[in-house]
A protein has these predicted regions:
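Conserved nucleotide-sugar donor-binding catalytic segment
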Residues: 8, 142-224
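Membrane-interface aromatic/basic loop that binds lipid-linked glycans or pyrophosphate carriers
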Residues: 258-314
Length: 314
């Protein structure tokens, strides 16, 4: 197999872990890559950190105007526009690649050539780099409905940095799928990339996702989060009911299962937002705000009650 050029992109806003993130890329055992760092007009000194490196594979850009958390996917897609590699990954400024990440991806591509998307096994770490948990193992090959089913049943977690996607495919299909706050953007992007040919998964640990208090998924207005969920679930319903998608007997079984649990999964997501909001803003009165505004928020009394009950354990 010919040498593969990888594009590793970092849409950067936070500086705290950026040095470690860059070092993890430069320390790869496979060295044929470009590192694209896009400063989202951050108030933190991103440029000072990047300027410490003279590696010619690093390409630094800065937005004239901040995309912000709500429109963060715009930043992902701007990174994509700069990419020249055959495959691209988009990682957070606080995440890390394991040393053999790209080497393992070359092995996976060689074993399963011609796909539009590949997946890395991920460790979830805390702010100090301590292991919190390991992402679940996945079958080496699977189709779109198997992927969706695992997420709807809450048996999987995944992040944008888990995925390696063929650059030409992504550019030809509108880039990363945009939802406010990127809620569901990584999932839908992966599903669409796997729609025709499926995905190849590695069960070698290749990526580290860092959970911390400044992660986008922990921020944002509840109205925006609910808007994101509604848009994502609407698109997901269309995808699940797409009769044109190729599917064998197993995939057809997963498709039927996805159709049967979609509404329940959507309700669980809404209740999760309600629960987090009540827990963070006051269990004693916040549930009343939800009841008063339930029509505007398009949630039910049952959603609020179950969200409140869940918040008691937080």
């Amino acid at each position: 197999m010919n040498s593969i050029l990888f594009s590793i992109t970092i849409p950067a806003y936070k500086s705290t872990f950026l040095h470690s993130c860059i070092e993890s890329v430069l320390s790869q055992t496979y060295q044929d890559f470009e590192l694209i760092i896009l400063n989202d007009d951050s108030p933190e000194d991103i440029e000072k950190i990047v300027s410490q490196y003279s590696d010619k594979r690093i390409k630094y850009y800065k937005n004239e105007k901040n995309c912000g958390a709500v429109n963060v996917v715009d930043n992902w897609n701007k990174c994509l526009s700069y990419a020249n590699g055959e495959y691209i990954m988009c990682i957070g400024d606080d995440d890390m690649l394991c040393p053999t990440c790209l080497e393992e991806y070359t092995k996976l591509i060689s074993k399963h050539p011609g796909l539009d998307i590949y997946h890395a096994l991920t460790q979830i770490v805390d702010e100090n780099g301590n292991l919190k948990r390991l992402q679940e193992a996945r079958p080496e090959r699977e189709g779109i409905f198997s992927m969706i089913y695992g997420r709807l049943r809450n048996m999987r977690e995944q992040f944008i940095g888990d995925w390696l996607i063929r650059t030409d495919y992504l550019k030809a299909n509108g880039g990363y799928t945009k939802y406010p706050l990127a809620w569901g953007s990584d999932d839908m992007t992966a599903y669409l990339a796997a729609k025709d040919k499926g995905v190849a998964n590695s069960n070698v640990i290749m990526f580290q996702y860092r959970e911390n208090s400044r992660t986008i998924s922990t921020t944002g207005d509840v109205l925006i989060k609910l808007e994101s969920i509604n848009s994502f679930m609407s698109d997901l319903e269309k995808l699940i009911n797409d009769k044109s998608l190729p599917k064998d007997g197993l995939e057809r079984g997963f498709q039927i299962s996805c159709q049967s649990i979609l509404s329940t999964a959507e309700a669980i997501k809404r209740r999760g937002i309600i629960s987090d909001d009540i827990a963070s803003k006051g269990k004693a009165y916040r549930w009343l705000w939800w009841l008063i505004n339930k029509k505007q928020l398009n949630v039910t009394s049952s959603d609020i009650l179950k969200g409140w009950a869940k918040s008691l354990n937080k």
